[in-house]
Amino acid sequence: MVKSHIGSWILVLFVAMWSDVGLCKKRPKPGGGWNTGGSRYPGQGSPGGNRYPSQGGGGWGQPHGGGWGQPHGGGWGQPHGGGWGQPHGGGWGQPHGGGGWGQGGTHGQWNKPSKPKTNMKHVAGAAAAGAVVGGLGGYMLGSAMSRPLIHFGNDYEDRYYRENMYRYPNQVYYRPVDQYSNQNNFVHDCVNITVKQHTVTTTTKGENFTETDIKMMERVVEQMCITQYQRESEAYYQRGASVILFSSPPVILLISFLIFLIVG
């Protein structure tokens, strides 16, 4: 008799879960598609100029007026004003100042830094959405993409792009889509950080970009950022649908009752 009841409840649970899945799939996805109403990004019509001006009072990517990537006015990649890669003002590779390289401020421990604790939640989030980039304020690096084939309206620029496209990035930097109100804001920020990071990194290697390069790079990165937004929106929607499914009161009630029957 108990087995008959268990079989009936399993059937009811199966039907309820599939009903909720169907409802979840009908929910609208966040964000719009490419070119769905509204103006495009500010300054796009000016040839040769930067179509993605920085926002706010500081320089590019400066929330509080520091240099590039400086949340509080330190050097590049310095959260609190230390040297490059120095979170708290110590020497390179010194988390809290003092000591020689790799000592972390303690004498007699040459080249034996303490092992950082691993936060499993951060690891899971990075695996789901991309690797978090250190020193870039929570930005993640997307997976490599094929550079899009773009026509710029004249033979010279089309030929120039085909000959130099390998110099432009094939990955973009971005933040989670739930931090933006729409696709335009996501793409604008994605283009700014990606072009700036690629330009700085390449310039340090002795290679410079012309205005034509910057113009083409922005177009290429824009298309890749749109693709990245669509991927992240789909993944965000699927994660939300799963949470809604298993947090539905009827499903919770049925699962609880089924467990009660099995245990009892």
From Swiss-Prot:
Cu(2+) 4 binds at H96, G98, G99. Residues 25-241 are annotated as: Interaction with GRB2, ERI3 and SYN1. The normal, monomeric form has a mainly alpha-helical structure. The disease-associated, protease-resistant form forms amyloid fibrils containing a cross-beta spine, formed by a steric zipper of superposed beta-strands. Disease mutations may favor intermolecular contacts via short beta strands, and may thereby trigger oligomerization. Contains an N-terminal region composed of octamer repeats. At low copper concentrations, the sidechains of His residues from three or four repeats contribute to the binding of a single copper ion. Alternatively, a copper ion can be bound by interaction with the sidechain and backbone amide nitrogen of a single His residue. The observed copper binding stoichiometry suggests that two repeat regions cooperate to stabilize the binding of a single copper ion. At higher copper concentrations, each octamer can bind one copper ion by interactions with the His sidechain and Gly backbone atoms. Its primary physiological function is unclear. Has cytoprotective activity against internal or environmental stresses. May play a role in neuronal development and synaptic plasticity. May be required for neuronal myelin sheath maintenance. May play a role in iron uptake and iron homeostasis. Soluble oligomers are toxic to cultured neuroblastoma cells and induce apoptosis (in vitro). Association with GPC1 (via its heparan sulfate chains) targets PRNP to lipid rafts. Also provides Cu(2+) or Zn(2+) for the ascorbate-mediated GPC1 deaminase degradation of its heparan sulfate side chains. Disulfide bonds join C190-C225. Cu(2+) 1 binds at H72, G73, G74. The gene is PRNP. It is found in: Cell membrane; Golgi apparatus. Monomer and homodimer. Has a tendency to aggregate into amyloid fibrils containing a cross-beta spine, formed by a steric zipper of superposed beta-strands. Soluble oligomers may represent an intermediate stage on the path to fibril formation. Copper binding may promote oligomerization. Interacts with GRB2, APP, ERI3/PRNPIP and SYN1. Mislocalized cytosolically exposed PrP interacts with MGRN1; this interaction alters MGRN1 subcellular location and causes lysosomal enlargement. Interacts with KIAA1191. GO terms for cellular component: Golgi apparatus; plasma membrane; side of membrane. Residues 242-264 form a propeptide. It is a lipid-anchor; GPI-anchor. Coiled coil: none annotated. One of its GO terms (molecular function) is copper ion binding. The keyword Metal-binding applies. A lipid is attached at A241 (GPI-anchor amidated alanine). Sequence repeats lie at residues 54-62, 63-70, 71-78, 79-86, 87-94, 95-103. Keywords: Amyloid, Cell membrane, Copper, Disulfide bond, Glycoprotein, Golgi apparatus, GPI-anchor, Lipoprotein, Membrane, Metal-binding, Prion, Repeat, Signal, Zinc. It is linked to Variations in PRNP are responsible of transmissible bovine spongiform encephalopathies (BSE), a class of neurodegenerative diseases that affect various mammals. These diseases are caused by abnormally folded prion proteins. BSE can be subdivided into at least three groups: classical, H-type and L-type, with the latter 2 collectively referred to as atypical BSE. Susceptibility or resistance to a BSE disease can be influenced by at least 3 factors related to the host prion protein: protein expression levels, number of octapeptide repeats, and specific polymorphisms. This is Major prion protein. Belongs to the prion family. Glycans are attached at N192, N208. Cu(2+) 3 binds at H88, G89, G90. SUPFAM superfamilies: Prion-like. Residues 55-107 have a biased composition (Gly residues). It comes from Tragelaphus imberbis (Lesser kudu). Cu(2+) 2 binds at H80, G81, G82. Residues 1-24 form the signal peptide.
